[in-house]
UniProtKB/Swiss-Prot annotation:
This protein may be expected to contain an N-terminal transit peptide but none has been predicted. It is found in: Mitochondrion matrix. Pfam families: Sdh5. This is Succinate dehydrogenase assembly factor 2, mitochondrial.
Amino acid sequence: MLRITYKLPIALRQQAFVARKLVPTIKANYSTNSDDDVVSRIKVHPIKRINESIDKKRARLIYQSRKRGILETDLLLSGFAAKHLRSMTNEELDEYDALLNELDWDIYYWVTKNYKTSPVPERWKNSEILKKLQDFSENKEKKILRMPDLENY
């Protein structure tokens, strides 16, 4: 019986060899432990801003409220910012700033009170800003949400 054998090209054999050597190293960097909090390992910590003027802070928060990356969160936060940002105290601005450092989907689920998907952490349970956002998200005026014009800030 005639057996046909195929030999891999040298480049592919070298890649396969490299892959066999690297895979154990790569796997060692990832945890299969379900208790391991992957988010805390990959989360980028916010820049601490020192001596930022209140006007500059408001301008930055407007931008961060509008440019989240997830449309649902963009609409909620930008509308909320247009309505409330001008009247917030410096302490409320700091709290809102800290909230914007959370993950987008977490903010969305907390604001829409979807606690089963993403429970509110202790640090946000008594937050006045989160309560205002939740009240805003109920849309009691039954308006269609859209990105507010920049003049509304």
